[in-house]
Regions:
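Ser/Thr-rich low-complexity repeats and stalk/linker segments
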Residues: 1-254
Length: 254
């Protein structure tokens, strides 16, 4: 992968296989040039199909598709450049999939009531972006759904949420990891709150940091964390914070 990013800031990269399993996670240092150059080993364990590469820097995310063993995309991915939006702002929703293909793009509220719907069509390289006006959207969690008779994908986002969640509890699905492993965390906090999730190495350096949100029941989960492939052994820390409220979980990398 080649491209550009903000200079002098680390870039988080994850790769999902056709079964939506994260098979690779890396932290890529970006120097003053802002240039991205990334390679990963392609082994026989990789199955044929369409893979999803997600790059995150600060709270901005970009997604791209690539194929192994086939020449065409056989899935759709919908994503937003970030997860949390101010009230009365605008959200850019991107759809990736087979080239020159029509999809219905729906915006649904938490009760699956349709707030907005339109038809979009991918361009010759399989992408399109639509700007949704969030004026009049009440505070809460929403879903962007891209679909046609063959494919469907969903991305959640929030509008008008604030920090300060009250008590936070969460856990990771396991406590022992190796370099390149994906981390899934699941937890609870105050309803409709923004959380900052951080991964901290044994030297106290923050390796990854991003925002997520709780739903109206106060639950949250994310698989956007991962151990860098060249990670040092030792005790790492996962931290969830919302305003003055915070919770830490210790994991071991070996």
């Amino acid at each position: 992968m080649t491209g550009t990013a903000q200079p002098n800031k680390d870039l988080s990269l994850s790769i999902k296989d056709p079964n939506d399993t994260i098979v690779r996670f890396d932290i890529l240092p970006i120097d003053e040039s802002g240039e991205i150059k990334y390679e990963f080993p392609y082994t026989q364990s990789f199955i044929e199909g369409t893979y999803v590469l997600t790059a995150t820097q600060d709270d901005i995310t970009q997604v791209s598709l690539f194929t192994l063993g086939t020449d065409s995309y056989d899935r759709v991915v919908v994503y937003l450049e970030k997860m949390n939006f101010f009230a009365n702002s605008k959200a850019s929703v991107s759809v990736l999939g087979p080239p020159s293909t029509e999809f219905t793009l729906d915006i649904l509220d938490y009760g699956d009531n349709k707030k907005f719907s339109t038809l979009v069509k991918t361009n010759s390289v399989g992408s399109t972006t639509f700007v949704v006006d969030l004026t009049g959207y009440s505070s809460g969690v929403y879903k962007a759904v891209a679909s046609n008779p063959l494919y469907q994908d969903t991305a959640k986002f929030s509008v008008g949420l604030s920090s300060g969640s009250g008590n936070i509890t969460f856990s990771s699905t396991k406590l022992q990891y190796s370099g390149g492993d994906n981390i899934l965390i699941i937890g609870n906090a105050g309803a409709n709150s923004i959380l900052n999730i951080s991964l901290i190495d044994p030297n106290g350096e923050t390796v990854t940091k991003f925002e997520i949100f709780t739903d109206k029941e106060g639950t949250f989960s994310t698989d956007m964390l991962g151990i860098p492939s060249n990670a040092m052994d030792g005790e790492w820390q996962i931290k969830a914070q919302s305003g003055l409220d915070h919770k830490e979980v210790i994991i071991t990398v070996s």
